[in-house]
Curated annotation (Swiss-Prot):
Other facts: This putative ketoacyl synthase lacks the active site cysteine.
Function: Involved in developmentally regulated synthesis of a compound biosynthetically related to polyketide antibiotics which is essential for spore color in Streptomyces coelicolor.
Species, as recorded: Streptomyces coelicolor (strain ATCC BAA-471 / A3(2) / M145)
Domain Ketosynthase family 3 (KS3): 13-416
Protein name: Putative polyketide beta-ketoacyl synthase 2
Protein backbone atom coordinates (compact mmCIF):
# COMPACT_ATOMS: atom_id res chain seq x y z
CA UNK A 1 0.00 0.00 0.00
CA UNK A 2 1.33 3.42 -0.85
CA UNK A 3 1.34 6.27 1.65
CA UNK A 4 -1.82 8.14 2.61
CA UNK A 5 -3.09 10.96 0.43
CA UNK A 6 -2.73 14.23 2.30
CA UNK A 7 -4.72 17.24 1.19
CA UNK A 8 -2.52 20.00 2.54
CA UNK A 9 -5.07 21.22 5.07
CA UNK A 10 -2.56 22.19 7.73
CA UNK A 11 0.52 24.37 7.43
CA UNK A 12 1.01 27.38 5.21
CA UNK A 13 0.25 31.01 5.94
CA UNK A 14 -3.45 30.64 5.07
CA UNK A 15 -5.08 28.62 7.82
CA UNK A 16 -8.59 27.14 7.46
CA UNK A 17 -10.89 27.66 10.43
CA UNK A 18 -14.50 26.73 11.19
CA UNK A 19 -16.75 29.71 11.95
CA UNK A 20 -20.28 28.35 11.51
CA UNK A 21 -22.26 25.14 12.02
CA UNK A 22 -25.60 24.14 10.54
CA UNK A 23 -27.12 20.86 11.71
CA UNK A 24 -30.19 18.85 10.72
CA UNK A 25 -30.18 15.51 12.48
CA UNK A 26 -32.63 12.96 13.90
CA UNK A 27 -32.07 14.79 17.20
CA UNK A 28 -33.62 17.95 15.76
CA UNK A 29 -33.03 21.03 13.66
CA UNK A 30 -30.26 23.37 14.74
CA UNK A 31 -27.07 23.15 16.76
CA UNK A 32 -28.76 23.59 20.13
CA UNK A 33 -31.23 20.72 19.72
CA UNK A 34 -28.55 18.40 18.36
CA UNK A 35 -26.01 19.18 21.06
CA UNK A 36 -28.47 18.84 23.94
CA UNK A 37 -29.53 15.39 22.77
CA UNK A 38 -25.94 14.29 22.11
CA UNK A 39 -24.69 15.57 25.47
CA UNK A 40 -27.58 13.85 27.27
CA UNK A 41 -26.85 10.56 25.52
CA UNK A 42 -30.30 10.56 23.94
CA UNK A 43 -31.13 8.10 21.18
CA UNK A 44 -33.33 9.17 18.29
CA UNK A 45 -33.31 5.79 16.59
CA UNK A 46 -36.78 4.41 16.01
CA UNK A 47 -39.01 2.38 13.71
CA UNK A 48 -38.94 3.31 10.04
CA UNK A 49 -42.16 5.27 9.46
CA UNK A 50 -41.72 6.48 5.89
CA UNK A 51 -44.63 5.61 3.60
CA UNK A 52 -44.08 2.49 1.51
CA UNK A 53 -41.42 0.96 3.78
CA UNK A 54 -43.52 -1.29 6.03
CA UNK A 55 -42.82 -4.43 3.98
CA UNK A 56 -39.04 -3.94 3.87
CA UNK A 57 -36.67 -5.81 6.22
CA UNK A 58 -35.04 -2.59 7.46
CA UNK A 59 -36.89 -1.81 10.71
CA UNK A 60 -34.80 0.77 12.56
CA UNK A 61 -33.31 4.05 11.35
CA UNK A 62 -32.67 7.64 12.34
CA UNK A 63 -35.38 9.77 10.74
CA UNK A 64 -35.55 13.57 10.75
CA UNK A 65 -39.02 14.37 12.03
CA UNK A 66 -40.84 17.69 11.80
CA UNK A 67 -38.67 19.12 9.04
CA UNK A 68 -40.56 21.54 6.80
CA UNK A 69 -38.31 22.65 3.96
CA UNK A 70 -40.74 25.41 3.02
CA UNK A 71 -39.87 27.24 6.24
CA UNK A 72 -36.39 28.04 4.95
CA UNK A 73 -36.33 27.25 1.21
CA UNK A 74 -38.18 29.03 -1.59
CA UNK A 75 -40.68 27.13 -3.75
CA UNK A 76 -38.61 27.56 -6.90
CA UNK A 77 -35.86 25.48 -5.30
CA UNK A 78 -38.17 22.98 -3.62
CA UNK A 79 -39.87 21.85 -6.82
CA UNK A 80 -36.61 20.97 -8.55
CA UNK A 81 -34.75 19.29 -5.70
CA UNK A 82 -34.80 16.14 -3.56
CA UNK A 83 -35.09 15.90 0.20
CA UNK A 84 -31.30 15.53 0.57
CA UNK A 85 -30.85 18.90 -1.13
CA UNK A 86 -33.63 20.43 0.98
CA UNK A 87 -31.54 19.41 3.99
CA UNK A 88 -28.43 20.97 2.44
CA UNK A 89 -30.13 24.26 1.60
CA UNK A 90 -31.60 24.56 5.08
CA UNK A 91 -28.41 23.51 6.89
CA UNK A 92 -26.44 26.03 4.82
CA UNK A 93 -28.76 28.81 5.91
CA UNK A 94 -28.30 27.78 9.54
CA UNK A 95 -24.51 27.61 9.14
CA UNK A 96 -24.26 31.04 7.52
CA UNK A 97 -26.42 32.53 10.28
CA UNK A 98 -24.30 30.80 12.93
CA UNK A 99 -21.17 32.29 11.35
CA UNK A 100 -22.87 35.69 11.06
CA UNK A 101 -21.85 35.59 7.42
CA UNK A 102 -24.11 37.70 5.21
CA UNK A 103 -24.11 39.39 1.83
CA UNK A 104 -22.12 42.32 3.21
CA UNK A 105 -19.27 39.93 4.09
CA UNK A 106 -18.84 38.75 0.49
CA UNK A 107 -16.21 40.89 -1.26
CA UNK A 108 -16.80 38.99 -4.48
CA UNK A 109 -19.05 36.01 -5.29
CA UNK A 110 -15.88 34.34 -6.57
CA UNK A 111 -14.39 34.43 -3.06
CA UNK A 112 -16.90 31.87 -1.72
CA UNK A 113 -16.93 28.22 -2.80
CA UNK A 114 -19.10 25.19 -2.07
CA UNK A 115 -17.97 21.58 -1.54
CA UNK A 116 -20.33 18.78 -0.53
CA UNK A 117 -20.21 15.00 -0.36
CA UNK A 118 -23.04 12.68 -1.35
CA UNK A 119 -23.53 8.94 -1.28
CA UNK A 120 -27.11 8.19 -2.23
CA UNK A 121 -28.26 11.22 -4.22
CA UNK A 122 -31.89 12.10 -4.81
CA UNK A 123 -33.55 8.72 -4.34
CA UNK A 124 -36.95 10.02 -3.23
CA UNK A 125 -37.30 12.39 -6.19
CA UNK A 126 -36.02 9.69 -8.52
CA UNK A 127 -38.49 7.10 -7.22
CA UNK A 128 -41.42 9.42 -7.85
CA UNK A 129 -40.32 10.14 -11.41
CA UNK A 130 -39.66 6.46 -12.15
CA UNK A 131 -43.17 5.67 -10.94
CA UNK A 132 -44.48 8.36 -13.29
CA UNK A 133 -42.46 6.88 -16.14
CA UNK A 134 -43.66 3.30 -15.73
CA UNK A 135 -47.14 4.15 -14.54
CA UNK A 136 -48.08 6.96 -16.92
CA UNK A 137 -45.39 7.26 -19.60
CA UNK A 138 -42.40 9.44 -20.39
CA UNK A 139 -44.45 12.60 -20.88
CA UNK A 140 -45.24 12.53 -17.17
CA UNK A 141 -41.57 12.67 -16.12
CA UNK A 142 -40.60 16.18 -15.03
CA UNK A 143 -37.53 17.94 -16.43
CA UNK A 144 -35.92 18.30 -13.00
CA UNK A 145 -35.37 14.55 -12.74
CA UNK A 146 -32.23 15.12 -14.80
CA UNK A 147 -30.64 17.16 -12.00
CA UNK A 148 -32.45 16.33 -8.75
CA UNK A 149 -31.07 12.78 -8.41
CA UNK A 150 -27.48 13.81 -9.15
CA UNK A 151 -24.83 13.67 -6.42
CA UNK A 152 -23.73 17.24 -7.22
CA UNK A 153 -27.25 18.68 -6.91
CA UNK A 154 -26.70 20.10 -3.43
CA UNK A 155 -23.45 21.81 -4.38
CA UNK A 156 -25.09 23.38 -7.41
CA UNK A 157 -28.26 24.52 -5.67
CA UNK A 158 -26.44 25.95 -2.64
CA UNK A 159 -24.12 27.92 -4.90
CA UNK A 160 -26.98 29.17 -7.11
CA UNK A 161 -29.24 30.15 -4.23
CA UNK A 162 -26.48 32.11 -2.47
CA UNK A 163 -24.67 33.39 -5.58
CA UNK A 164 -21.43 31.70 -4.55
CA UNK A 165 -19.17 31.43 -7.61
CA UNK A 166 -15.87 30.32 -6.12
CA UNK A 167 -14.40 26.80 -6.41
CA UNK A 168 -17.22 24.25 -6.19
CA UNK A 169 -17.22 20.48 -6.21
CA UNK A 170 -18.67 17.26 -4.87
CA UNK A 171 -16.79 14.37 -3.28
CA UNK A 172 -17.88 10.80 -3.96
CA UNK A 173 -15.84 8.75 -1.50
CA UNK A 174 -18.61 6.76 0.15
CA UNK A 175 -18.99 7.43 3.89
CA UNK A 176 -15.49 8.87 4.15
CA UNK A 177 -16.52 11.57 1.67
CA UNK A 178 -17.81 13.87 4.38
CA UNK A 179 -14.35 14.27 5.90
CA UNK A 180 -12.78 14.49 2.46
CA UNK A 181 -15.16 17.33 1.52
CA UNK A 182 -14.06 19.30 4.56
CA UNK A 183 -10.43 18.63 3.67
CA UNK A 184 -11.00 19.88 0.11
CA UNK A 185 -12.63 23.00 1.53
CA UNK A 186 -9.59 23.62 3.72
CA UNK A 187 -7.31 23.09 0.73
CA UNK A 188 -9.31 25.62 -1.30
CA UNK A 189 -8.88 28.14 1.52
CA UNK A 190 -5.16 27.48 1.64
CA UNK A 191 -4.99 28.02 -2.13
CA UNK A 192 -6.64 31.43 -2.02
CA UNK A 193 -10.41 31.12 -1.51
CA UNK A 194 -11.59 33.17 1.47
CA UNK A 195 -14.67 31.11 2.39
CA UNK A 196 -16.01 27.65 1.56
CA UNK A 197 -19.40 26.28 2.56
CA UNK A 198 -18.93 22.53 2.96
CA UNK A 199 -20.54 19.42 4.38
CA UNK A 200 -22.92 16.61 3.53
CA UNK A 201 -26.58 15.75 3.90
CA UNK A 202 -28.30 12.48 3.06
CA UNK A 203 -31.91 11.30 2.66
CA UNK A 204 -31.62 7.53 2.10
CA UNK A 205 -34.89 6.40 3.69
CA UNK A 206 -37.32 6.45 0.76
CA UNK A 207 -38.41 2.91 -0.26
CA UNK A 208 -36.30 2.92 -3.43
CA UNK A 209 -33.24 4.08 -1.49
CA UNK A 210 -33.72 1.46 1.20
CA UNK A 211 -34.02 -1.32 -1.37
CA UNK A 212 -30.70 -0.19 -2.83
CA UNK A 213 -29.10 -0.57 0.61
CA UNK A 214 -30.44 -4.04 1.37
CA UNK A 215 -27.47 -5.59 -0.41
CA UNK A 216 -25.11 -4.26 2.28
CA UNK A 217 -24.30 -7.11 4.68
CA UNK A 218 -23.28 -4.43 7.20
CA UNK A 219 -26.84 -3.06 7.44
CA UNK A 220 -28.55 -3.96 10.72
CA UNK A 221 -31.76 -5.98 10.50
CA UNK A 222 -32.50 -5.64 14.21
CA UNK A 223 -36.07 -4.79 15.09
CA UNK A 224 -35.47 -3.01 18.42
CA UNK A 225 -33.91 0.49 18.39
CA UNK A 226 -31.75 -0.16 21.46
CA UNK A 227 -30.22 -3.26 19.81
CA UNK A 228 -29.84 -2.10 16.22
CA UNK A 229 -26.51 -0.26 16.42
CA UNK A 230 -24.03 -1.31 19.11
CA UNK A 231 -20.44 -1.04 17.84
CA UNK A 232 -17.46 -2.37 19.80
CA UNK A 233 -19.63 -4.93 21.60
CA UNK A 234 -20.04 -8.68 21.22
CA UNK A 235 -23.67 -8.02 20.26
CA UNK A 236 -22.75 -5.77 17.31
CA UNK A 237 -24.97 -6.64 14.34
CA UNK A 238 -24.38 -3.82 11.87
CA UNK A 239 -25.40 -0.18 11.62
CA UNK A 240 -28.73 1.62 11.51
CA UNK A 241 -28.91 4.14 8.63
CA UNK A 242 -30.00 7.74 9.07
CA UNK A 243 -30.89 10.91 7.23
CA UNK A 244 -29.87 14.51 7.87
CA UNK A 245 -26.41 15.99 8.05
CA UNK A 246 -24.40 19.13 8.66
CA UNK A 247 -22.91 22.07 6.80
CA UNK A 248 -19.91 24.08 8.00
CA UNK A 249 -18.58 27.51 7.10
CA UNK A 250 -14.82 27.30 6.65
CA UNK A 251 -12.87 30.53 6.29
CA UNK A 252 -9.34 31.79 5.97
CA UNK A 253 -8.39 32.76 9.51
CA UNK A 254 -7.24 36.32 8.82
CA UNK A 255 -10.34 37.08 6.75
CA UNK A 256 -12.57 35.65 9.48
CA UNK A 257 -10.91 37.76 12.15
CA UNK A 258 -11.10 40.86 9.99
CA UNK A 259 -14.89 40.63 9.87
CA UNK A 260 -15.09 39.82 13.59
CA UNK A 261 -16.08 36.16 13.29
CA UNK A 262 -15.61 33.68 16.12
CA UNK A 263 -13.02 31.02 15.31
CA UNK A 264 -14.62 27.78 16.51
CA UNK A 265 -11.94 25.31 15.42
CA UNK A 266 -8.96 24.91 13.13
CA UNK A 267 -8.80 22.23 10.44
CA UNK A 268 -5.31 21.06 11.29
CA UNK A 269 -4.68 17.90 9.26
CA UNK A 270 -6.24 15.27 7.02
CA UNK A 271 -5.23 12.13 5.16
CA UNK A 272 -7.04 9.40 3.24
CA UNK A 273 -6.37 5.87 1.99
CA UNK A 274 -8.24 3.14 0.13
CA UNK A 275 -8.29 -0.57 1.00
CA UNK A 276 -11.15 -2.06 -1.06
CA UNK A 277 -14.78 -2.99 -0.49
CA UNK A 278 -15.61 -5.28 2.42
CA UNK A 279 -11.98 -5.89 3.35
CA UNK A 280 -12.39 -4.92 6.97
CA UNK A 281 -9.29 -6.70 8.21
CA UNK A 282 -7.22 -4.78 5.65
CA UNK A 283 -8.84 -1.52 6.70
CA UNK A 284 -6.72 -1.73 9.86
CA UNK A 285 -3.58 -0.72 8.00
CA UNK A 286 -5.38 1.75 5.75
CA UNK A 287 -7.04 3.57 8.62
CA UNK A 288 -3.85 3.57 10.70
CA UNK A 289 -1.96 5.17 7.82
CA UNK A 290 -4.69 7.77 7.39
CA UNK A 291 -4.48 8.61 11.10
CA UNK A 292 -0.69 8.86 10.97
CA UNK A 293 -0.87 11.06 7.88
CA UNK A 294 -3.42 13.40 9.43
CA UNK A 295 -1.38 13.70 12.63
CA UNK A 296 1.79 14.38 10.66
CA UNK A 297 0.11 17.12 8.63
CA UNK A 298 -1.25 18.68 11.81
CA UNK A 299 2.12 18.51 13.55
CA UNK A 300 0.34 16.58 16.29
CA UNK A 301 1.89 13.91 18.51
CA UNK A 302 -0.31 10.90 19.36
CA UNK A 303 -0.46 11.86 23.03
CA UNK A 304 -1.87 15.29 22.10
CA UNK A 305 -5.12 13.74 20.86
CA UNK A 306 -7.74 14.42 23.55
CA UNK A 307 -10.73 12.64 22.02
CA UNK A 308 -11.44 10.29 19.12
CA UNK A 309 -14.75 10.30 17.27
CA UNK A 310 -14.78 6.74 15.97
CA UNK A 311 -16.14 5.48 12.68
CA UNK A 312 -17.89 2.74 14.69
CA UNK A 313 -19.41 0.65 11.91
CA UNK A 314 -21.01 -1.90 14.22
CA UNK A 315 -19.60 -4.92 12.38
CA UNK A 316 -17.35 -7.05 14.63
CA UNK A 317 -14.53 -7.44 12.10
CA UNK A 318 -14.63 -3.74 11.20
CA UNK A 319 -14.76 -2.63 14.85
CA UNK A 320 -11.78 -4.85 15.65
CA UNK A 321 -9.84 -3.36 12.74
CA UNK A 322 -10.60 0.18 13.91
CA UNK A 323 -9.52 -0.53 17.48
CA UNK A 324 -6.28 -2.08 16.23
CA UNK A 325 -5.70 0.81 13.81
CA UNK A 326 -5.92 3.25 16.71
CA UNK A 327 -3.40 1.15 18.63
CA UNK A 328 -1.10 1.04 15.60
CA UNK A 329 -1.28 4.81 15.04
CA UNK A 330 -1.45 6.14 18.60
CA UNK A 331 0.58 3.52 20.41
CA UNK A 332 -0.03 3.21 24.18
CA UNK A 333 -2.13 6.39 24.09
CA UNK A 334 -4.86 4.48 22.21
CA UNK A 335 -5.90 2.69 25.41
CA UNK A 336 -6.06 5.97 27.37
CA UNK A 337 -7.64 8.51 25.02
CA UNK A 338 -11.43 8.87 25.34
CA UNK A 339 -13.24 7.44 22.31
CA UNK A 340 -16.85 8.19 21.47
CA UNK A 341 -19.41 7.37 18.79
CA UNK A 342 -22.48 9.57 19.31
CA UNK A 343 -23.78 8.44 15.92
CA UNK A 344 -25.17 5.34 17.66
CA UNK A 345 -27.93 7.67 18.87
CA UNK A 346 -28.74 9.11 15.45
CA UNK A 347 -27.86 6.33 13.06
CA UNK A 348 -25.22 6.37 10.39
CA UNK A 349 -26.05 9.03 7.80
CA UNK A 350 -23.52 7.76 5.25
CA UNK A 351 -21.46 10.73 3.89
CA UNK A 352 -23.12 13.05 6.38
CA UNK A 353 -22.18 10.97 9.44
CA UNK A 354 -18.57 12.18 9.76
CA UNK A 355 -19.60 15.81 9.12
CA UNK A 356 -22.06 15.51 11.99
CA UNK A 357 -19.17 14.10 14.02
CA UNK A 358 -17.04 17.13 13.11
CA UNK A 359 -19.81 19.49 14.20
CA UNK A 360 -20.22 17.51 17.42
CA UNK A 361 -16.45 17.54 18.00
CA UNK A 362 -16.39 21.34 17.70
CA UNK A 363 -19.22 21.59 20.23
CA UNK A 364 -17.55 19.08 22.56
CA UNK A 365 -14.36 21.15 22.60
CA UNK A 366 -16.35 24.33 23.24
CA UNK A 367 -18.47 22.86 26.04
CA UNK A 368 -15.72 20.83 27.70
CA UNK A 369 -17.79 17.66 27.48
CA UNK A 370 -17.24 14.39 25.64
CA UNK A 371 -20.63 12.93 24.66
CA UNK A 372 -21.40 9.27 25.31
CA UNK A 373 -22.09 6.38 22.96
CA UNK A 374 -25.79 5.47 23.30
CA UNK A 375 -26.86 1.80 23.52
CA UNK A 376 -23.29 0.61 24.21
CA UNK A 377 -22.42 -0.74 27.65
CA UNK A 378 -20.08 -3.75 27.50
CA UNK A 379 -17.09 -2.86 25.33
CA UNK A 380 -15.10 -5.84 24.07
CA UNK A 381 -12.06 -3.92 22.78
CA UNK A 382 -9.15 -2.19 24.51
CA UNK A 383 -10.68 1.27 24.12
CA UNK A 384 -11.72 3.91 26.63
CA UNK A 385 -15.14 4.22 25.03
CA UNK A 386 -17.30 6.87 26.69
CA UNK A 387 -20.60 5.20 27.56
CA UNK A 388 -23.55 5.84 29.84
CA UNK A 389 -23.15 9.56 30.38
CA UNK A 390 -21.06 12.44 29.04
CA UNK A 391 -17.57 12.88 30.47
CA UNK A 392 -16.34 16.33 31.57
CA UNK A 393 -13.01 17.13 29.93
CA UNK A 394 -11.10 19.95 28.27
CA UNK A 395 -10.41 18.53 24.81
CA UNK A 396 -8.31 20.78 22.61
CA UNK A 397 -7.52 18.30 19.85
CA UNK A 398 -10.04 15.93 18.28
CA UNK A 399 -9.43 13.09 15.84
CA UNK A 400 -12.42 12.23 13.63
CA UNK A 401 -12.44 8.94 11.68
CA UNK A 402 -14.53 7.69 8.78
CA UNK A 403 -14.61 4.61 6.56
CA UNK A 404 -16.75 3.79 3.58
CA UNK A 405 -18.33 0.46 2.72
CA UNK A 406 -16.43 0.50 -0.55
CA UNK A 407 -13.02 0.85 1.12
CA UNK A 408 -12.31 4.55 1.69
CA UNK A 409 -10.58 5.55 4.93
CA UNK A 410 -10.27 9.12 6.16
CA UNK A 411 -8.93 10.88 9.25
CA UNK A 412 -9.21 14.54 10.24
CA UNK A 413 -7.56 16.47 13.07
CA UNK A 414 -9.35 19.46 14.58
CA UNK A 415 -7.86 21.92 17.06
CA UNK A 416 -10.00 23.99 19.37
CA UNK A 417 -10.28 27.65 18.33
CA UNK A 418 -7.34 29.27 16.61
CA UNK A 419 -3.94 27.61 16.63
CA UNK A 420 -0.77 29.70 17.03
CA UNK A 421 1.85 29.25 14.30
CA UNK A 422 4.02 27.08 16.54
CA UNK A 423 1.15 24.59 17.14
CA UNK A 424 -0.66 23.70 20.28
Amino acid sequence: MSGPQRTGTGGGSRRAVVTGLGVLSPHGTGVEAHWKAVADGTSSLGPVTREGCAHLPLRVAGEVHGFDAAETVEDRFLVQTDRFTHFALSATQHALADARFGRADVDSPYSVGVVTAAGSGGGEFGQRELQNLWGHGSRHVGPYQSIAWFYAASTGQVSIRNDFKGPCGVVAADEAGGLDALAHAALAVRNGTDTVVCGATEAPLAPYSIVCQLGYPELSRATEPDRAYRPFTEAACGFAPAEGGAVLVVEEEAAARERGADVRATVAGHAATFTGAGRWAESREGLARAIQGALAEAGCRPEEVDVVFADALGVPEADRAEALALADALGPHAARVPVTAPKTGTGRAYCAAPVLDVATAVLAMEHGLIPPTPHVLDVCHDLDLVTGRARPAEPRTALVLARGLMGSNSALVLRRGAVPPEGR
